[in-house]
Amino acid sequence: MLAAVLGAVALYTFIGFIPGTDETSVLAPVTLALVLSGAPPQVVLSFFVSAVVTLNLMNGIPTALVGLPGGVMSAPLMEHSVLLRNRGLASDTIRKMAVGSAIGTLVSIPLSFALAGLIARFAEPIKAQAPLILAACAVLLALLGRNRILALVAIVPMALMFEALPALYHATHIIPADKKVSISFFLGITVGPMLVTLLELLNPRRREALPHGDRTRTALLRSGFRSQALMPGNLVTRSEGWWSTAMAALSTPLFMLSPVGLTFLLGEASVARMKDDPVRRSQRAVTVMSALTHSTYLAGVIIPLVALGFPVSGVSAGPAMPLFEAPPVYDLDHQDRKSTRLNSSHARLS
């Protein structure tokens, strides 16, 4: 188990530095390979949790330093990270992200296991109504945003597209009828803005409107690396710590909602009244959002896996899907108890 944890830290430390990565594309294949290798479910879960913590933490570095989203979960932090970078506070931003990540992890893991114990008794009704619950969560998340009507309307074409693409693949025999296809649209959250920016360079007017000047001078400072300065209590203010703790705890029971959406909504809610000082506002936002990136992701895999044994969240149906379905080791198609106990990581963990 320790080897799996250390391996995840080593691997995703390097992957996390690469901007624009998709969590599903970098977490799911390695997790699937580990499951198919015959590793015990406790080892696989430890690996996955370690990978999530490391990846989300390292994704904050390119976000803070160069203004590029390290991953899908870094997208909500972009605006505040760029503002702080322009003020010369990139190194402070990385430290605040690290403390926020630690807070989110420490709050979410025990709370997720506690909630899983409470929800386990309602597992069968939740499984039976999973499609309706997920649809209701999508509507709720749309209503919590600013452009409510547009968000509600957008659900329909997105749902049609996700149903139409597998049907098209089966109809054209690209994929056999008895096989499944998984669609991950999360990569578009990070790659989409980059592609739009590159396409804008083809427009002469847009190109001329871009800032032009000399080379940017960069200086690396050693300030803030004293042992006392690296204490968590000196890196974040008391309000930033309390807001991070509160929002991480609040997001954990909402594990069925989108982790990106929760990170943005709850993170912005924590700074809604801070309009006078943009720097302090952004510092609190990056701290709270870093806590939320960890709490939402960890709750999204721990609670469905431990309590339900069925993917009912975006995380469990995406990056963590090999923990639920990885034939022939884990198979959701087996409905009877004997088969379920033989083919379920949920049963082996319980």
Predicted segments, located by residue:
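Membrane-interface alpha-helices at helix entry/exit sites of multi-pass transporters
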Residues: 41-46, 83-100, 276-288, 316-317
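Helix-loop-helix hairpins and the membrane-proximal interhelical loops
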Residues: 1-40, 117-125, 186-281
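Transmembrane helix boundary and interhelical junction motifs in multipass membrane proteins
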Residues: 17-29, 59-63, 71-74, 257-266, ...
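Central hydrophobic cores of alpha-helical transmembrane segments
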Residues: 26-30, 152-163, 316-321
